[in-house]
Amino acid sequence: MTVHSTWKEKVQLKKDQLNSKIKDEWKLNSTTITRLKNDKKNLIKNIDDLCSSSENQITHSTIMALRQALEAKELSCHEITAAFCHRAALIHQVVNCLSEIMFSEALRLADYYDSNRPAILPPLYGIPISLKDQCNVEGVDTSLGYLCRTFKPKTKNEESLIVSFLRDLGAIIFVKTTVPSSMMATDTQSNTFGYTYNSINLSFSSGGSSGGEGSLIGAHGSLLGLGTDIGGSIRIPSSYQGLFGLKPTFGRVPYLRVDNSFEGRETIPSVIGPLARDLSDLRYFMSCVINICQPWVQDVKCIPYHFDSSTSKLHDNYVVGIWYGDGVIDPPPSDIRALKTCEDLVNKTKGMKAVKWEPSSELSRELFDLANEADVADSGNEIKNEFEISGEPLLDILKPMVLENGRPPYTVNEWWDLTKRVYNAQQLMRDYYLSFPESERPDVIISPTTLMPFRPGDMLKTTLRYILLFNVLNFPSLSIPVGSVDCQIDGLMDTTSALNPEDKMIKTYWNDLIQSGEIDGFPIGLQVVSPTFNDNEVCKFASWLFSKI
């Protein structure tokens, strides 16, 4: 048997394992799958049509509403769990978003909860929660999209602390979701699981690296799930599927025993946080994990903190920074329109004002460069080695990470220099913030995120310039949906006014999407950010904003 056939056979074994965990009555025939894939902008409605009205009522609800129904005994844990398992199975067969299926285990636990109902229900009792693949769950794989890590189920001792917390809170873990191999790409693809499509518009990528989460939640296959973010991996899929996604300050949600690429990298670290359809659910979840579980007791990297789950009242003389552009890449007309809507609302509200947030383009470039340099500091050796173990071919989306003919890995001294540059850049941004008069220093900043979606294979035609810098700065950032693209209103961008070749590429790609009409109706995603540790502030302001828009 050749190496080539061996890796392909192992891929098929993994796909067969996944497929075997879907009930026969939930499996779609090829004709139906093709029909749903071709109706690219109507997946939610089409999945609704395949589910019962009671299932749709459950899956289109919120955590808070389902909790109330459970408390009133209007719904059982089994009914809720079965509804989400069924819907997740249907969605997966169209967009390919699941890496591990635990339907049988979830339904057994739901039945146990119904038979052993406590007098006071734990905060997430009976609520199905989805997990990005890298979260370790006893009895199932954590592959990170690498074929060589499949068929190696985790033990009880390897289970992630956050998973243990979810169990303590009463949640029901029912699926893990797809990631790009290594998780170091914004497009969710692997040889093992294939390609994950956007559930709002199947013409586009789901984003990454928490693409499976974004696609599943976007189509109501889960109310809330956990993702991670080292360079937009929560915010990009959230933006692309019209969701709320929180990249917290480092040390908020425990990363203990969560598998990762580049483990041990402390400069520009990855963080773990929720993606959700409903902002109140997201805030409630964070308050449960932080206030009740107190992760700092067990995870030495977590910081004591109280998370505010409900306040939306803002203090007097509230200041909002509006970031219309970094001087390197111009945001598209849809983002400008959404930013202007937010700015006008703030300025019309008594006791609030908007100011322009305009850090220098030189600082923006440095922050972007630092993130990229950190990502390839080992010249891609870790990624390359993982692929070589199984013999699977390196994916095109990862070739920018593997410097075949480039420089050698950073020396210790070069890494120290990079770390120093990160600190200096963070301080320069703090200095810019302090340069505002005290009465005009922004409490939060509203910024573009992804600018536009991309078609499968077009990952490198978009930019992360409005995303990566907040990882370098360790600013909390909340992705928020603000309307949708209107091809007639938003229109084309002027490529003759491009600031540089990259800007011209972005403008040209935008024009292609507008002229094709594919992008019409696509969610517009912005992000609310604030200086380090102000996680409460970004959520509080977003709650206020959505009570007004």
Curated annotation (Swiss-Prot):
Name of the top EC class for this enzyme: hydrolase
Protein name, entry field: Probable amidase
Keywords: Hydrolase
Family note: Belongs to the amidase family.
Alphabetical list of Pfam families matching this protein: Amidase (PF01425)
Reaction(s) catalysed (UniProt annotation): a monocarboxylic acid amide + H2O = a monocarboxylate + NH4(+)
Residues at the catalytic site: 132, 209, 233
Keyword Coiled coil: no
EC number from the UniProt entry: 3.5.1.4
One GO biological process term: amide catabolic process
GO molecular function, one term: amidase activity
Keyword Hydrolase: yes
InterPro entries linked: Amidase_CS (IPR020556), Amidase_dom (IPR023631), AS_sf (IPR036928)
